[in-house]
Amino acid sequence: MEGIEVVGEIKSKAVDPKGMAAVFSDRIFVKPTDPKWKEFPAVCMPKAFLGDFERTKNFKIYEDDVWLIGFPRSGTTLVQEMMWLMMNDYNYEGAKSVDTYNRAQWFDFFNVTHPIQGVDVGYQDRMPRPRIYKCHYPVQFLPDQIWTVKPKIVHIVRDLKDVAISYYYLRKNQWHEDIENIEDHFEDMFSAKTWYTPYREHIENYKRIPDYPNIFYMTYEGLMADKPNVTRKLAEFLGKPISDENLDQLLDHCKFEKMRGKLTS
């Protein structure tokens, strides 16, 4: 396939080869052929990514888009909710009545699962602006226009141990992958056999983006340790300074017990 080279594959052990578990556990190792990224190592990606690679690379980007990016299980769903409310005048009724993923699209998840779920993936293009996208892709597989249009990017990192444990329960309990135990998951993850690994390269490559003026770096631990201050900085970055009243309401809305059902990635 033009633009991408497949250098390895992991076959699914799922009972239903056409079910969701197979979508999640069928994996490939790929490298981009674009000279800009030729030095980057092979990355483990869902096999279904091949069918959406061209659309992803050619995806239309607007200057007022905002991309929230992080490795899976890094706190992106929490920050996604905060960002949507900041950018939509704290419309809590709208947040309650419309599913999170219809307000701020999980870009990579729908790209690889829409054939089975029947999701209208074209909705990603038609979302009302300003659009918010959550994405876990490694930097070399983002849409090409990101590097020319330069929309705002929020990048979040979480401690590797916590990510690895949380990722195990996601694979076991929600994706229903055929994993014997957490040790097998750790072996997969640390040998770069789970989605978007190798982990350290995923994180470090986003920190080395050259000449990118619109990126906000944050950590999950920093947010948990000082929610008011980090939230204010995020709001300032988005061009949405936050009042004390709105800050209190937002932090209450985003308490863990209230977000529990939404915290999927």
Where are these regions (language model features)?
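PAPS-dependent sulfotransferase catalytic domain
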Residues: 2-218, 228, 245
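Non-catalytic, well-ordered alpha-helical segments in soluble enzyme domains
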Residues: 89, 230-241
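Short, surface-exposed acidic
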Residues: 95, 239-249, 259
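An alpha-helix initiation/capping motif
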Residues: 221, 248-251
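Acidic, metal-coordinating catalytic cores used for nucleic-acid/nucleotide bond scission
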Residues: 223-226
